[in-house]
């Protein structure tokens, strides 16, 4: 049994999250078609600094992530520093933890703050599913390398003459796990079947997600944490997420066919999060540094945990594994939480995690714990909707969830919030936040 691990600096300062911002999220090939992730990252960090009125030289480190990486800009963090007017001396490096990438970025900045190497930093992530690294076949790639080494035109022609037409076809990015060949949707189907999650339950969760997200926008709750994005050719700005279904009915979801298991499946495009473009970032500081600058934090990072599970079975169970660890390290239980925000990769994955969190048997036989993490109160769960509605730019989702949860906690008078996500490769992440 782990003991509570307070996240404080050597001087006893808490880790403060003073500000957070994101772009509107856009479905693949819509508002951000042709806009690379690095530009989305520059956009959000530049605007975040402008709104916070924090002098750029105050920021000593920027940790940023991108899951679908572009070969021409492998260190997106450094490109953002150089493209936003920040000091060229700002330390910057990139991280990748699949769908939990900005969770990792936040943890890394927090660790720098606790170590005392910095007093303020930015963490976040950006991804584009509209600007993708389209590759070439292995045979063509090898031929190009060999041709570069060839000394004569004849040698080059001989190499290229061995290629067939199919070798010249472009190769799109893989959508399956490298180690298993399974797609995320295949795992979502497996989890639904194994744990008895019905199509009706999945559709109901997806419908709820869209309803609550639409309501959050209608009530103006997201206005301050989402910037207006201007992208080439600068004709129409984007000020809201464009994936949210504002007028759908539950009956509409039943009309869609399964997307992965065509005959017997229950996972559809409507009860899954779509491919999405966007960026999000947060500013973290030591509590004393925020006080020196006259800033009121949105809240504080109380604890975090990262876990890993098998990739062949129940690969998306990260939240059920990481949540009890994060709660334990925070010295809290599920009952102490005011809000719980779980990344909705698929409705089946979300419902399976909720089901197993409440299971004593799962706790004993799988986690090796004496009792269940706890049943999640629906009135506390994803109260502003989730990723099924907002979309999921892989590296940006964690920062969205953190900012959104802290702002909602403040509207409710403070308390503790949990944000948690599954990720490719069987990874999981959870963070406990505190607002006053």
Curated annotation (Swiss-Prot):
Keyword Transferase listed: yes
Reaction(s) catalysed by this chain's protein: an acyl-CoA + acetyl-CoA = a 3-oxoacyl-CoA + CoA
Keyword Endoplasmic reticulum annotated: no
Biological source species: Cronobacter sakazakii (strain ATCC BAA-894) (Enterobacter sakazakii)
Top-rank taxon, per record: Bacteria
Coiled coil: none
Record-stated family: Belongs to the thiolase-like superfamily. Thiolase family.
HAMAP family: FadI
Any one GO MF annotation of this record: acetyl-CoA C-acyltransferase activity
Protein name: 3-ketoacyl-CoA thiolase
Assembly, per entry: Heterotetramer of two alpha chains (FadJ) and two beta chains (FadI).
Gene Ontology CC terms, in alphabetical order: cytosol
Function: Catalyzes the final step of fatty acid oxidation in which acetyl-CoA is released and the CoA ester of a fatty acid two carbons shorter is formed.
EC number of this enzyme: 2.3.1.16
Biological process (GO), any one: fatty acid beta-oxidation
Main location: cytoplasm
Localization, UniProt: Cytoplasm
UniProt keyword terms in alphabetical order: Acyltransferase, Cytoplasm, Fatty acid metabolism, Lipid degradation, Lipid metabolism, Transferase
Enzyme class: transferase
Catalytic center residues: 99 (acyl-thioester intermediate), 392 (proton acceptor), 422 (proton acceptor)
Pathway where this protein functions: Lipid metabolism; fatty acid beta-oxidation
